UniProtKB/Swiss-Prot annotation:
Alphabetical list of SUPFAM superfamilies matching this protein: alpha/beta knot
EC code: 2.1.1.177
Family that this chain belongs to: Belongs to the RNA methyltransferase RlmH family.
Annotated keywords: Cytoplasm, Methyltransferase, rRNA processing, S-adenosyl-L-methionine, Transferase
PANTHER family registered for this protein in UniProt: METHYLTRANSFERASE, RIBOSOMAL RNA LARGE SUBUNIT METHYLTRANSFERASE H
Protein name as it appears in the record: Ribosomal RNA large subunit methyltransferase H 2
UniProt cross-references to Pfam families, sorted A to Z: SPOUT_MTase
Compartments where located: Cytoplasm
Organism encoding this protein: Caldanaerobacter subterraneus subsp. tengcongensis (strain DSM 15242 / JCM 11007 / NBRC 100824 / MB4)
Keyword GTP-binding recorded: no
Length: 148
């Protein structure tokens, strides 16, 4: 089983880096897991320019996704899932014969529409908005508990 997390931006805060390392170290003992970071574009401030930023980041994300992968995008407008539902979704993806499950975390502006269309499922951890850097840590924690 291979797990890939495609995330826009880099982690700057040490406390988040430490948490990510904690869960990655645990998961890597059992699973082939990697994080692929996509360059984050600066927010230009205008709606038209923001859409261009989403497109640029989205094209980079799509380039990294294999055709044979099961893709789960984390999007604020996605289906809100519980820990149990998340675990069931991940296990189901591997049970369907997919060799890789790809999770996508967008940047501060979200995820481009075409990436959400490519995803097999769009989920949300909460109706609240979290910094995308913190979402990476939350995702790893949920993956860890889903695959125990």
């Amino acid at each position: 089983m291979k797990i890939q997390i495609i995330a826009v931006g880099t982690i700057k805060e040490n406390y988040i880096k430490d948490g990510i390392k904690f869960y990655l170290d645990k998961l890597k003992k059992i699973y082939d897991i990697e994080i692929v970071e996509i360059k984050e574009e600066e927010d230009p401030g205008t709606p038209a320019s923001r859409e261009k930023v989403l497109e640029t980041e989205g094209e980079r994300i799509l380039y990294k996704i294999d055709r044979e992968s099961f893709v789960i995008a984390l999007a604020i407008e996605g289906k809100e899932v519980s820990t149990e539902e998340f675990a069931s979704l991940v296990k189901k993806a591997f049970g369907m014969g997919y060799k890789k499950v790809v999770f996508v975390i967008g940047g501060s502006l979200g995820i481009w529409g075409k990436v959400k269309e490519r995803a097999d499922v769009n989920i949300s951890f909460s109706k609240m908005t979290f910094p995308h850097q913190l979402t990476r840590l939350l995702l790893l924690e949920q993956i860890y508990y889903a695959l125990l």
